[in-house]
């Protein structure tokens, strides 16, 4: 059987329980979506073999995660509830897809994940496994046995497992598109996370301007430095913007299973990229390109959050989003300051805010006053007819 492995308490329990108590042959796989260093991945692999897995595989999914998911979140300027860049929910889908592919490759008879019965991840993993590897047995020991953290620790200690059992004051989930932060403050409806809870501490003061270069909606350069892949640009921008404490917030959302949840997150690079990209779009896209794209992108983000990445409608929306980016090319200038940033402006050969076509609020040479009088009369003609008939029948 294949186990999606993170090296944490839940998946460590799964390995030991399934190998020692059930006698199963467990093949662990970790999908790196930007949250682990090489040394951390090596330590996780060592830990997996110590626990008793038959094989352990590390999948580097950073680039495919961007290509298949993040790219479209940027195209759509997607923020769940106008706040959250879907940092963890998008990441889980990439992980589930790769775990399913690994299970198919090994012709596994079962697939295992360490989700509890309380959150969104159980639905995302179960649903994608059911779609991609139909008929395979899905085993979820933590959920099915309703295990507490204390019970898991006691079991692993009884088996002589050595690992860090200290529960951190804050749960951290780091990835390419942001980091979630959970603690006692997020378990209630009021309260801010303290400074020490944030994984990236503020080390920069003053201000700094960065130039982001987009080509057809994708971030290709930062301050004229080119990158082989946009995921590398995201990681580089994170090192710059993260030190200003940018992209910190608390998201209140509706879970797939019907309860509301509150989670902190820091997403310096994602938030700067999304706002910069949106600013560029507002200059180069027409009114209704923006209007329809906003509607489709909102649905796309909501459906992605629900785990429905395999729905064919998502490919249809992605095709539209891709098409909309044909002219989203140019430079965006962003000023970074501690805890905030602002878009200074853009430069693009596709900028529709060209002075030769008129200046907002000023005189222009593109039309005459008589042209506007005629246009205004025709533009409101049907509404005028409606109100005329309405009044005559009262």
Residue ranges and their predicted role:
Residues 1-4, 9-394:
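Nucleotide-activated chemistry modules centered on ATP-dependent adenylation/adenylyltransferase
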